[in-house]
């Protein structure tokens, strides 16, 4: 009887519907790609365009050089597209994007960025076509592209009163100026003068690379290593700018001593900057 009758009440069994049911976590719907967002920063379309063009240009140069019969053809086309068609384009896109952080004003976006992309694409196509008119349309488009970037950056630094970056728009203008000299010389057939102007453009591009390096190397190093403090090298940067300008003028005016002094000083300052950035930290 003890085993048959229990005085402890047995709780009723809850229905399955009364139990707590697990629920899937709410997933927010993915945001659809937006053309407006794509055109907010210059690096998005211009990086893609530059990389795509690099692949096409290398393929043409390696596998189909016979097709390069345009007024700007052969080695002149190859050198031009390597420097101004690709490297300078990527640099301009970076400076437009970084300029938004440096000044708090986005220099190039929306319709202005669309115009810049169209000008850049017209130049790439025009320099491939075997017509004199196409060459001049391409040249005008490319020079307007660099002028547009220079003016956009100048507007941002003036409006924000960002004196630290006053030199940037003039670097872009100088890059476009060297491009103009190169293109004009390409039509004259003077190869030595052509390479002289190419070297000026290459030196200006190296100066822009030094500027970018002075900004991003300390920034990312201090973010990666807690407690690391690195100088901004603003003063040496201005001296480096003047030294590179002296070197560029020396190339244009065929003054070897000015080239040696300018580039030598710029190189020494670059070594000083690297050492003060504590590469072994």
Protein language model features and the residues they cover:
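Hydrophobic alpha-helical transmembrane segments of multi-pass integral membrane proteins
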Residues: 2-281
């Amino acid at each position: 009887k003890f085993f048959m009758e229990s005085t402890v009440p047995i709780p009723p069994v809850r229905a399955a519907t009364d139990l707590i049911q697990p629920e899937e976590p709410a997933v927010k719907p993915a945001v659809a790609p937006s053309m407006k967002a794509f055109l907010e920063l210059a690096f998005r379309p211009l990086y893609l365009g530059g990389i795509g063009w690099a692949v096409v240009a290398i393929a043409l140069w390696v596998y189909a050089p016979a097709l390069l019969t345009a007024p700007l053809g052969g080695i002149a086309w190859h050198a031009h597209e390597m420097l101004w068609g690709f490297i300078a384009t990527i640099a301009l896109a970076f400076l437009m994007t970084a300029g938004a952080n440096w000044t708090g004003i986005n220099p190039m976006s929306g319709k202005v960025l669309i115009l810049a992309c169209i000008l850049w694409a017209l130049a790439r196509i025009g320099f491939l076509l075997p017509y004199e008119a196409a060459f001049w349309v391409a040249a005008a488009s490319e020079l307007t592209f660099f002028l547009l970037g220079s003016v956009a950056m100048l507007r941002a630094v003036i409006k924000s009163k960002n004196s630290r970056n006053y030199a940037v728009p003039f670097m872009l203008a100088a890059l476009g100026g060297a491009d103009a000299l190169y293109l004009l010389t390409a039509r004259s057939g003077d190869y030595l003068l052509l390479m002289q102007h190419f070297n000026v453009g290459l030196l200006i591009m190296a100066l822009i690379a030094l500027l970018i390096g002075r900004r991003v190397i300390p920034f990312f190093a201090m973010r990666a290593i807690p407690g690391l403090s690195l100088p901004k090298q603003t003063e040496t940067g201005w001296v480096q700018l003047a030294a590179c300008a002296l070197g560029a003028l020396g190339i244009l005016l065929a003054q070897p001593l000015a080239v040696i002094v300018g580039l030598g000083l710029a190189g020494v300052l670059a070594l000083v900057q690297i050492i003060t950035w504590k590469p072994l930290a």
